[in-house]
From Swiss-Prot:
Sequence positions that bind Zn(2+) 1: H109, H113, H119
Record note on quaternary structure: Monomer.
InterPro entries: MetalloPept_cat_dom_sf (IPR024079), Pept_M54_archaemetzincn (IPR012962), Pept_M54_archaemetzncn_arc/bac (IPR012091)
Tagged with keyword Zinc: yes
E.C. code: 3.4.-.-
Ligand binding (Zn(2+) 2): C120, C125, C144, C147
Name the record gives this protein: Archaemetzincin
Functional description taken from the UniProt entry: Probable zinc metalloprotease whose natural substrate is unknown.
Amino acid sequence: MRPRITVVAPSRIKPLEIPEFTTIWQFKDIDISHFLDLARGQCRADKVVEALSNGVKSPTVYVLDCDGYYPGLNFVFGLAVPVLKTAVVFTARLVGPRFEERLVKEITHEAGHLYGLAHCANPSCVMYFSNSLLDTDRKSPYFCPKCRENLARIL
């Protein structure tokens, strides 16, 4: 049995198959203006997750149409806080002809963190840390055997 996640996405995004998870899609256009750091033109990821986690009871990944950052990093594609059961994926850097593929990978990656998986050293594994879009494009949308085994142990 696959683990379950809820994905809350802007209404412009169509539901996508997230191969490693049973996925419930909800559509909500979230006002990002109060998350935006005007000096950077980016949303601070940890503050976004904290704000959106209110009332979350099961693993939930929010998809936001903005660019995200975390203190000490120029940008992040997403951030998960397992204790809050909440993650966020930012779409700004995923644009292009591979947008849907990239979005699936980033949702899967952050959902993996929500279930307790760490970053993986295997560059083909979806849990590999992406420093760039090239890293995201190279990796698959699937867990490697080691991460799949770790997830099975966690579940």
